[in-house]
């Protein structure tokens, strides 16, 4: 039994394994550890991390390792609050299963040592601050204060997470054009380093695609021009580096028109490779013109697209600010067809979440609720509930950060200089 395992581990390690593990295996969720300065000591407090805050008294026994001047001190945090000596950093290499929130003053200290940390910690710090802003534990401008420290970043995994988070921010704040300039500045060094020419290093290949796509979707003119140049050559000669295809196709759709849509669609129809078809479906969801988006949505339900690929295509359009409402309307208008095709499998819940979880207004919250009261797919109840919760999280995220982020962006345009 489990208790026997804990007892054996406890006997060998001489550590209170059973006492600690019971709080992790017999209750749901995971903790947030907040750190504040109190007099001449640090105060650590724990609470359950929730994107939608509610009263919750859950406590964990958390093994805490704090680092200061190359020394490590260990604590077992079983109470709501404990005090420790001052330290530089907590949760080295992200070995602890908890999020960390530093107060504003301590966060500045962490920012000053980021470049000395390993990739796991650089990722953990960045991911924590963004997650905390999503859950309204901190302001989103703290995330933007942090990011210039990553200007010389080279790790693929770190950049992938930064890119994903910035993409989500741009989706929720589409009118803040200063974000594009911020992203271009943040990614400028890595772009100079890796450019367009392929190196057969797996991580660099992956990194290049992320960097180019992020810059292109942030309206970097030079990157978009180079993508157009390479795509035109591809149309004439069928030659394009496979490692660059998704990035180039995505940028062509984002900056393209009806002509480019026709070219991408023809490539899709003519291709016999499923991998290529997936790339093209994903990229065609990035057009911004209403008439093209509507045409592509119709194409998705045509005989040209396999049933199992519909979710990928729908998700791509729904993840496009210009396509979300159109995708939702299309889903409602064609609900019977979606239910006929996907009503008994896993695709229907995925389609519902890919669309509805991206809304961020109370109006849409009510609209989604009303629609699924009348149309209740049997296997998607959990997906509907998750989507409604996501809308509430998104609403709070936008409401709590729209004004402060806009002000921060306007007053920090020279932050990279």
What are these regions (language model features)?
Residues 63-65:
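Extended repeat-based solenoid scaffolds, especially LRR ectodomains
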Residues 25-27, 54-59:
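A short catalytic or substrate-binding loop motif that flags glycine-/basic-rich loops and adjacent residues
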Residues 7, 36-38, 43-45, 52-56, ...:
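Long, ordered, helix-rich scaffold segments
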Residues 1-49:
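Gly/Pro-rich turn-and-neighbor structural signature
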């Amino acid at each position: 039994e489990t208790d026997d395992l804990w007892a054996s581990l406890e006997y060998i390690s001489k550590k209170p394994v059973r006492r600690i593990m019971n709080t992790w295996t017999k209750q749901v969720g995971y903790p947030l550890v907040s750190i504040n300065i109190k007099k001449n000591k640090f105060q650590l407090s724990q609470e359950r991390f929730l994107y939608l805050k509610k009263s919750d008294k859950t406590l964990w026994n958390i093994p805490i390792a704090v680092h200061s001047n190359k020394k490590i001190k260990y604590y077992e945090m079983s109470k709501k609050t404990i005090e420790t000596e001052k330290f530089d950093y907590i949760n080295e290499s992200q070995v602890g299963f908890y999020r960390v929130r530093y107060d504003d003053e301590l966060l500045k200290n962490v920012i000053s040592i980021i470049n000395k940390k390993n990739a796991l910690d650089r990722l953990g710090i960045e991911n924590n601050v963004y997650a905390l802003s999503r859950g309204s534990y901190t302001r989103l401008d703290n995330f933007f204060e942090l990011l210039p420290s990553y200007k010389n970043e080279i790790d693929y995994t770190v950049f992938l997470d930064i890119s994903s988070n910035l993409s989500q921010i741009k989706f929720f704040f589409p009118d803040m054009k200063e974000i594009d300039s911020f992203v271009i500045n943040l990614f400028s060094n890595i772009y100079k380093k890796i450019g367009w020419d392929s190196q057969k290093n797996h991580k660099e290949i992956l990194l290049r695609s992320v960097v180019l796509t992020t810059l292109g979707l942030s309206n970097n003119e030079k990157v978009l021009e180079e993508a157009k140049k390479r795509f035109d050559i591809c149309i004439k000669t069928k030659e394009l580096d496979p490692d660059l295809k998704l990035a180039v196709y995505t940028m062509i759709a984002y900056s393209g028109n009806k002509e480019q849509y026709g070219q991408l669609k023809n490539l899709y129809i003519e291709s016999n490779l499923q991998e290529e078809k997936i790339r093209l479906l994903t990229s065609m969801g990035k057009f911004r013109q209403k008439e093209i988006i509507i045409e592509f949505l119709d194409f998705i339900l045509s005989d040209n697209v396999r049933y199992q690929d519909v979710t990928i295509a729908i998700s791509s359009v729904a993840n496009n600010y210009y396509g979300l409402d159109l995708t939702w309307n299309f889903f409602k208008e064609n609900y019977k067809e979606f239910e006929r095709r996907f009503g008994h499998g896993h695709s229907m819940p995925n389609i519902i979440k890919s669309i509805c979880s991206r809304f961020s207004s109370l109006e849409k919250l009510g609209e989604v609720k009303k629609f699924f009261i009348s149309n209740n797919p049997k296997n998607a109840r959990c997906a509907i509930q998750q989507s409604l919760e996501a809308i509430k999280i998104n609403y709070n995220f936008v409401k709590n950060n729209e004004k402060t982020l806009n002000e921060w962006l306007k007053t920090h345009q020279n932050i990279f200089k």
